Amino acid sequence: MRIMKLAIISLSVCFLVLEPSAFQGGKRVIRRDASSNSPFSSAVAAGDFIYLSGTLARGDGIREQARGVLDNLGEVLELAGADYSRVASVTVYLRNTSDFQGMNEVFQEYFQSEPPTRTTVQTDLVREDALVEMSMIAIRPGAERTVLQPQGWPASTAPYSYGIKSGDTVFLAGILGRDYSYNSSVGSDIQAETRAIFENARQILAVAGMSLNDVVASRVYITDTTLFRDMNAAYSAHFPDIPPARATVRANLMGDQYHLEITLIAVAGTKTRITRPNADGTPGRESPVLSHAVRVGNRLYLSGMLGVSDETRTDTQGQARQTLATIGRTLDAAGFGIDDLVDGVVYLTDMSEWGEMNVAYREAITSNFPARAAVGTGLMSGDGRVEIMFTAVR
């Protein structure tokens, strides 16, 4: 296993030293040094999966930073009892799309065979000199890790797999609106791209004996917010019963010809749609395009949530506080609690307000923090300043 003995550099913008794991309920928290003030854990292990926080590294240029990030994540994997061969899913956040090739070359050095699934998008990062951030989900040693390759599709020449199956769970790569069988475009119409994405997802899931009905979580990256409504019209047609939990953000992709990339997680088993009550206790209302949360087994996948109101319209801290209150009501409705959170992603429209968001975040989550990434993107709400999406495990 390729691991350099480096200090972890993450979103706290300081060097951190890992210390032994702590246990909280059904999750194992991989802790940093107690002197760290970071409101996220390096990793959280729960069930068969290990959730690793978004991680940065210092260095000159994309290649040096990408190696530093992957070495840092390798140290966290080692502390969790795993290594690179157990990684199932990676999300790569690049400051500049021009750094894609350099990042890709380094990534391939670490994942030379049976690589994980991967999503790569352009976002803002918390540190001005940071060029790349990566977060991961890994599979505990001893649990199944099977690469999914649809029949008739050419083997991927890029360092990622189309799908990874572990037990009842499938992680899909970020899927684009093209015909993967022939590696050809389906045109620039957003609805055609959306339909192509779900046809591709259907074929990947079929290899595992699963279908779109098993999808529980969806992260949607769209390049132009004016396309959101048309995308939704095509999207909702694929989930007539229980739509997955979802977050949708504006982000640039690695190819200018594409307007949409979607990352999915599917879990076989009986699903329960969670509809949270309103703040005043009245019944909540279902959305045709997403579930507030989806419960399957001992896991809960929550949609990205916002906290926009007349009082918080220009207040990032206020929006974060209201968002986390909404998340709390959603957890309660599902029979979960804050301590069950294992993984999250925070989308901010202005990364200079990262500290303001964290004030509210620490009020709601006071210890045994979930793993977390925090990046800068556009949101679908014109007044939205922060959106937060979580996974919980009991």
Task: Label the predicted regions.
Residues 19-89, 94-199, 203-217, 222-342, ...:
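N-terminal presequence-like segments and the immediate start of the first folded domain
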Residues 7-17:
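Bacterial N-terminal signal peptides
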